[in-house]
A protein has these predicted regions:
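Polar/charged low-complexity regulatory segments
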Residues: 1-102, 108, 134-237
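Conserved hydrophobic residue
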Residues: 121-122
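Short, solvent-exposed positions on alpha-helices
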Residues: 125-126
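Non-transmembrane amphipathic alpha-helical segments
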Residues: 106-116
């Protein structure tokens, strides 16, 4: 990554280390039973999985081409650094290592593409375009995590939890819900009820059957924050 001042174009590049720190913060928020933290972690995990599949598929296509050269008698090795740098890594959440996996996959893919260019299997422009498009997708993912940390870690939203959405919640809780929904939209029902969960979460709340039914009703819009049944006919009409 680069800071805004270090970038020749005047904008910063979000590093994998920065994204790992953002995801650690959101992972910590999941301990508060925060549905938006769960939603973000699920989204990022899914997108990382998709990107890794794309890297594997595209890289394998190129690798197969190189293997054909070897079958014809030309032994080709994928490029690697003459002086590889060893870095000791340590992350305080599983999501840091998830980002490392993505970066490792991209590093391998980039070396395969550069090998293809060097061995005349791809042209210079094709190779640069392939790397540019893949880099663009990964950067888009990295950049997309920043607003979540910016807003969810604010003092006004830091205490947000599923209980804020339930009937009888305090005025402060309702304000947190209104702000979160206004910024991020409604949490998908499967995330809100816990049917779909992050791969790694600090959530430890045990939900009773009655509480689960209430969460489902709120997620489906059957009950409002005041506890009213929204399907009930209004007798004043």
């Amino acid at each position: 990554g680069r800071t805004r001042d270090e970038s020749p174009r005047g904008y910063g590049i979000t590093s994998g280390k920065k994204v790992a720190a953002v995801l650690r913060s959101i992972w910590n928020l999941s301990a508060n039973d925060n549905p938006y933290a769960d939603w973000i972690l699920v989204q990022v995990t899914d997108r990382v999985g998709e990107l890794r599949q794309q890297l594997e598929h595209a890289g394998k296509h190129f690798q197969d081409d190189l293997d054909k050269l070897q079958a014809r008698g030309l032994r080709v090795s994928v490029l690697k650094s003459r002086a590889p740098v060893e870095v000791e890594l340590g992350f305080r959440s599983p999501y840091g290592y998830m980002i490392v996996d993505l970066i490792l996959d991209f590093d391998w893919y980039a070396r395969v593409v550069k090998t293809m260019v060097q061995k005349n299997r791809l042209g210079d422009i094709e190779g640069k375009e392939d790397l540019y498009q893949m880099t663009k997708r990964i950067r888009a993912l990295f950049e997309s995590t920043l607003p979540y940390q910016k807003y969810l870690l604010r003092e006004e939203l830091r205490l947000l939890s599923r209980s804020d959405f339930l009937p009888g919640a305090s005025d402060e809780a309702r304000k947190r819900v209104e702000a979160a929904v206004g910024i991020f939209g409604e949490v998908p029902p499967p995330i809100f009820t816990g049917e779909v969960r992050p791969r790694h979460s600090r959530r430890r709340a045990d939900v009773s059957e009655a509480e689960m039914r209430l969460l489902v009703d709120v997620a489906q819009g059957k009950v409002d924050a005041a506890g009213s049944d929204l399907n009930q006919e209004n007798t004043l009409l």
